[in-house]
UniProtKB/Swiss-Prot annotation:
Pfam families on file: Pterin_4a
Catalytic activity: (4aS,6R)-4a-hydroxy-L-erythro-5,6,7,8-tetrahydrobiopterin = (6R)-L-erythro-6,7-dihydrobiopterin + H2O
InterPro entries linked: PCD_sf, Pterin_deHydtase
Species: Prochlorococcus marinus (strain MIT 9313)
Keyword Cell inner membrane in record: no
EC identifiers of the protein: 4.2.1.96
GO biological process per UniProt: tetrahydrobiopterin biosynthetic process
Keywords from the UniProt entry: Lyase
Name of the featured protein: Putative pterin-4-alpha-carbinolamine dehydratase
């Protein structure tokens, strides 16, 4: 699937469409804090399976019970529709 770079108008509405995500330097970023490492790693596993199915992979880190995810599309050198779709799907995986 070819990625489409987001327009300035689309970028301005990201905060409304994606609760919890922030926009910085052509990247979407979000951080989650879990009760422990096992919960954090379980969340990362679910995200990994989702990302693989969508063929769009995050940049991320895990420090004990904290997971940070950044999304960008290298092919278009910025944010694309693929980043929005993955962020929306990740939000549906959230615990609680």
């Amino acid at each position: 699937m070819t990625a489409t770079l987001l327009t300035a108008e689309q970028l301005s509405s990201v905060a409304e469409k994606l609760p919890g995500w922030t926009l910085a330097d052509q990247r979407l970023q979000r951080q989650w804090r879990f009760r422990n490492f096992v919960e954090a790693f379980g969340f990362m596993t679910r995200v990994a399976l989702l990302a693989e199915a969508m063929n769009h992979h995050p940049e991320w880190s895990n420090v004990y019970a904290t997971v940070t995810i950044e999304l960008t599309t290298h092919d278009v050198n910025g944010l694309s529709d693929r980043d929005l779709k993955l962020a929306e799907a990740i939000n549906l995986l959230e615990p609680g």
